[in-house]
Structure formats: C-alpha cells, structure tokens
C-alpha cells in the first residue's frame, strides 16, 4: 500500500457524512452517465470526495486548483482506483493550466470548482464546454467573488451554487478549518514559537477570524488590519488590536494574509518589517503578498528550510516567505482537518445532486444552496456525534408565526 492510499484510508475513517451519503445513494447511483469535472486541492480528503462521487455513479475527472497543493502520492492512488487524474505538484503554471484544459476536454456535465478557474476558462477560452455543462458548485470565497463578477457582466451561462456561502461551510471550514490548518502549516515549516509573538492578520473575514482566534489561543498578541470599518469594530470587540498595515508591520513577527485581495503589503511595508519576520498567505491566490516586489528589493534570495524562502533586503534585514506566497495550509501542509472537510464536501455533493434535479429551471446566475440542505448536513453531523437537540412545540411555532 503506497502512502497516498494510506492517507485516503485514514481520512475515510473520519468522514462519516461522506460515508453516509455513499451508503444512501450507492445503489441508486443518481450520477450514473454524468461526468463531474473537479478543480480542487488534490490531497487525501478531496480524493475521498472524488471516490464518493464515483460511488454515486459519476465519471470523475480531477485536477489541482493550485500548482503546489497537489500531493503526488494521493494522485497516484486515485488513478489506481479508476479516477481520471490530470495533476501533479509543479512550479510550472503552464502545466497547471494544461491540466485544467484536459479536464475540460472531458466535457463535464458538472464542475466542482475551487477558486473559479475551470468555470472562468470554460466561459472565455473553452466556450464549447458550455454546451454540455449543466451547473457549477464553487467552494471558495475567492471563486464565488469571481463568478458573481462574471454574472454581473452578463456573461455567466450556467447556474452556479455558492457552496462557500452556506452556513455549514463558512462557519466551520473558513473559520475553524483555516484557523487550525494555517497555524499547523506555519508551525511545522518554521518550528518557531507563537506565544508572546506579534501576529498580524490581514483581513477579518471568516478565515481571518479563525487565524486570529487560533493565534490568540497559542498565546500571541494579535493585530488585525482591515479596510472594512464594520469588521474592524468586530475585531476590536473580539479583543484584538486594529491598526493600519504600515504601523503593524513594524512590530510583526508573523504577517498572515487572508483578505482575498491583491498587494496587501506595499514595498514600504516590506521594508518596514522586522529582521526575521515571517510572511504567510492563507488566501486562495498568490497575489496577496507581492512576491515580485520581494524579488525586486532583495539583494539575496535563499532556501532557509523546505517551504521557507529567505529574502535579504536592500536595508540589510532578512524576511522569510512560506510556500512562495501560495496558500500556506495546502502548499506546505495537509489542509483543513478531516472532519471539517467532511461537512464542506457533503455540501458539495448535495449541490451537484441539486443541480442534477433542478438545472433546467435555473437561470445562469449565482445561487445560495437551499437552507434545507444546510440543515440536512447539520443534522447529519449531529447524528454522527450522537447529539440530540430540542424541537419546537406546535405552540412555539404558532407564536413565531404570529404578529399579535
């Protein structure tokens, strides 16, 4: 048994929702005759999602959603199980794009996207794919933002379900998943102490909240930078310090970006960093930390540790960048905890099944996943934990419906 198969077997023990879905639908096989194209961080948990979809009858074609997040041993294990895989860990963007194209060559009926690349390419460079494409399920904040922008231009041609905007996704995956996995990656790759350090978190959305929460739990002094005044007030009320980035970088031991935006640090911010400061990105794309600026102002670049690049700046200070500025928890770690992704991937499967049943009456726009599916996943999770909750009485239901 290779390491990839061992990893998949391990996660399968801790994904009760996917196991339950496979048990419920494997005889009916509702996806029989349909192709699901996936662009997703290819590691053990996503591999198990692909396997579960295949148990529901789908032909699954999968590639990575980030050049550095594919785990080659897992990709090989998936191939051995009959899944079509076009992916390998690479620093070459052209190979990454080539693999996206290969997935689209299979003319998928449904796309499960992570960041929106497959969907955007199918609407721009590969429009023939749209003839067969029935709908898209998008996993990430970044991807949903891109596809809503596509919708606003009037160019979106298929219905999209924003799985990211489901409560059972963002309240758990974005917050607890990102919080734990980001710090797991930072600590395993630097071996540095967090307690007593100044941690700057750029962006206080659900991902930023999780990163800040776990940093505080590790004993750090947490500083949040924001452009949204409401989120800034939230961060203050949660007990964190808020200040502009240009001030925060002067005292930062760690800077972690989670804004979903570009160029979160300026050249001046980088030059103001302390000697030995560590930079990590928890956003989907490698645009939040301006690596090109680091390259321009560095007089020396060197590998300090695996996944850690040192840059000696023109002012004599050295700063360290993790995972080339890519998504640190996946490019330099194993991603979110297994049980968290069990929730998100249950939502993904139900999104595909919803599209299968309803795509003909859906317009080409971005939809929320229906509340009843969110609630179904929540109840499945409670059942897997053996937890019971109260139910409203009929009197209570009448009271909530009344206006007098």
Curated annotation (Swiss-Prot):
Organism: Thermotoga maritima (strain ATCC 43589 / DSM 3109 / JCM 10099 / NBRC 100826 / MSB8)
Cofactor(s) annotated in UniProt: NAD(+)
Cofactor note: Binds 1 NAD(+) per subunit.
Residues reported to bind NAD(+): 140-142, 174, 203-208, 226, 261, 282-284, 329
Catalytic activity, EC: 3.13.2.1
The entry's keywords: Cytoplasm, Hydrolase, NAD, One-carbon metabolism
This protein's encoding gene: ahcY
InterPro entries recorded: Adenosylhomocyst_ase-like_sf, Adenosylhomocysteinase-like, Ado_hCys_hydrolase_NAD-bd, NAD(P)-bd_dom_sf, S-Ado-L-homoCys_hydrolase_CS
GO CC terms, sorted: cytosol
Tree of life domain: Bacteria
Family: Belongs to the adenosylhomocysteinase family.
Gene Ontology terms: biological process: L-homocysteine biosynthetic process; one-carbon metabolic process; S-adenosylmethionine cycle
Descriptive protein name: Adenosylhomocysteinase
Metabolic or biological pathway, per its Swiss-Prot or TrEMBL entry: Amino-acid biosynthesis; L-homocysteine biosynthesis; L-homocysteine from S-adenosyl-L-homocysteine: step 1/1
Substrates-to-products reaction catalysed: S-adenosyl-L-homocysteine + H2O = L-homocysteine + adenosine
Listed Pfam families: AdoHcyase (PF05221), AdoHcyase_NAD (PF00670)
Residues that, per the record, bind substrate: 114, 139, 169, 173
């Amino acid at each position: 048994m290779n390491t990839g198969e061992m990893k998949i077997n391990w996660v399968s023990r801790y994904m009760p929702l996917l196991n339950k879905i496979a048990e419920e639908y494997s005889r009916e096989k509702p996806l029989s005759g349909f192709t699901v194209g996936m662009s997703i961080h290819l590691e053990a948990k996503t591999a198990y999602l692909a396997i579960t979809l295949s148990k529901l009858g789908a032909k699954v074609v999968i590639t990575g959603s980030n050049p550095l997040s594919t785990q080659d041993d897992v990709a090989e294990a998936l191939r051995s199980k009959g899944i079509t895989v076009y992916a390998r860990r690479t620093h070459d963007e052209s190979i990454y794009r080539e693999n996206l194209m290969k997935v689209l060559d299979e003319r998928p009926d449904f796309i499960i996207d992570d960041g929106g690349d497959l969907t955007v390419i199918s609407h721009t460079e590969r429009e023939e794919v749209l003839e067969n494409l029935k709908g898209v399920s998008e996993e990430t904040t970044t991807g949903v933002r891109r596809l809503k922008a596509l919708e606003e231009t009037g160019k979106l041609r298929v219905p999209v379900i924003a799985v990211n905007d489901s409560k059972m996704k963002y309240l758990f995956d974005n917050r607890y998943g990102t919080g734990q996995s980001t710090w797991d990656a930072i600590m395993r790759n630097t071996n540095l102490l967090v307690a007593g350090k100044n941690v700057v978190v750029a962006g206080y959305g659900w991902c930023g909240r999780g990163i800040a929460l776990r940093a505080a739990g590790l004993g750090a002094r947490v500083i949040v930078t924001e452009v949204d005044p409401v989120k800034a007030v939230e961060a203050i009320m949660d007990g964190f310090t808020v200040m502009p980035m240009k001030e925060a970088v002067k005292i930062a031991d760690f800077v972690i970006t989670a804004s979903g935006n570009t160029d979160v640090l300026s050249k001046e911010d980088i030059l103001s960093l302390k000697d030995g400061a560590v930079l990590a990105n928890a956003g989907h794309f490698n645009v939040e930390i301006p690596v090109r600026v680091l390259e321009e102002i560095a007089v020396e670049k060197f590998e300090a540790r695996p996944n850690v690049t040192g840059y000696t700046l023109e002012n004599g200070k050295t700063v360290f960048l993790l995972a080339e500025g890519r998504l640190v928890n996946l490019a330099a770690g194993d991603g979110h905890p297994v049980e968290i992704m069990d929730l998100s991937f249950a939502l993904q499967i139900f999104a595909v099944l919803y599209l299968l049943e309803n795509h003909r009456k859906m317009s080409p726009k971005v939809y929320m996943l229906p509340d009843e599916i969110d609630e179904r996943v929540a109840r499945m999770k409670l059942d897997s934990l053996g937890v019971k909750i109260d139910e409203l009485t009929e009197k209570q239901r009448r009271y909530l419906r009344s206006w007098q």
